[in-house]
Amino acid sequence: LVLDVDGNPLEVGSEYYIGRAVGFYVVERFSEVDRGDPLSSDVQIDSGLSAYCRSDGFWGVPPSSFRIEKTEGFPNAYKIAYSPPTTSSQQQRYPDLHSGLNLVGLTDDSARVVL
């Protein structure tokens, strides 16, 4: 269950804003032991940024490859985590040249548009 800043459950079809708690781009932190749970419904995320995207903030993310996790120590605070694909054809990595971390949403597979 994901809650908004007022402690109410998120509602399908409603708009929510993610506070600026991260940098300008999203990276993958790979874990062999915790791959997370796939989402059961579509989630659309508007990054509001276009500095690193050709399509004015649109991200392509393979289906069921990210999840929302509760953060520790902050009430109603969450983070978006990436679950790497499980098939060998999807396990290509695209490292960021500056940080060496893997970028989220870069794949040659069919993608779901995230707004």
UniProtKB/Swiss-Prot annotation:
Signal peptide range: none
The superkingdom of the source organism is Eukaryota
Q: Which GO terms describe its molecular function?
A: serine-type endopeptidase inhibitor activity
What are the protein's UniProt keywords?
Answer: Protease inhibitor, Serine protease inhibitor
PROSITE patterns xref list? SOYBEAN_KUNITZ (PS00283)
Please give the coiled-coil regions recorded for this protein.
none
Asked whether the keyword Magnesium is assigned, the reply is no
Q: Which cysteines are joined by disulfide bonds?
A: none
Q: Which family does it belong to?
A: Belongs to the protease inhibitor I3 (leguminous Kunitz-type inhibitor) family.
Query: What role does this protein play?
Result: Exhibits Kunitz trypsin protease inhibitor activity.
Q: What is this protein called?
A: Kunitz-type trypsin inhibitor 1
Highest lineage ranks of the organism? Answer: Eukaryota, Viridiplantae, Streptophyta, Embryophyta, Tracheophyta
